[in-house]
Amino acid sequence: MRVAVVYSRGLAGLDAPLVRVEAHVGGGLPQFRIVGLPDTEVKEARDRVRAALNTSRFEFPDGRVTVNLEPADLPKESGRFDLPIAIGILAASHQIPARELANLEFAGELGLSGDLRAIRGALAMTFGAHRDGRTLVITESVAAEASLAPGAMILPARSLLDV
């Protein structure tokens, strides 16, 4: 059993509540499930994440992959969770070291090529990450907005490979 935990942020008005992304890679028939997103968002995120991992020269794990986004009662919309889902899968499948993730938060929509796309709420997410003592890894296209937060700790990236 392999489990990894990655942190991200939702968006609720001007607030950006913490979202814990748990990724589990286990044996069994190949299956990729995401729990905690509306059905349409789940299908779209699954397709984007799988394609981005493959085109970025990572291996999508064989077997059963389950991702849980919590808290379950927090509305989760848009592709902002693509990057943390991908990072969680990579850590749970031992393609990247999980120990380095504890002080980081991730947000970004993935294109099928692995490029990161802009998301809304970068400033609010940066404030939340800073308040919790973490560095925010975010798409380069919104890094200027995120850097407006005093004491902001951000790492801009253009693609999954940059991360």
Predicted feature residues:
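Peripheral, non-AAA+ core regions of ATP-driven protein-machinery
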Residues: 1-163
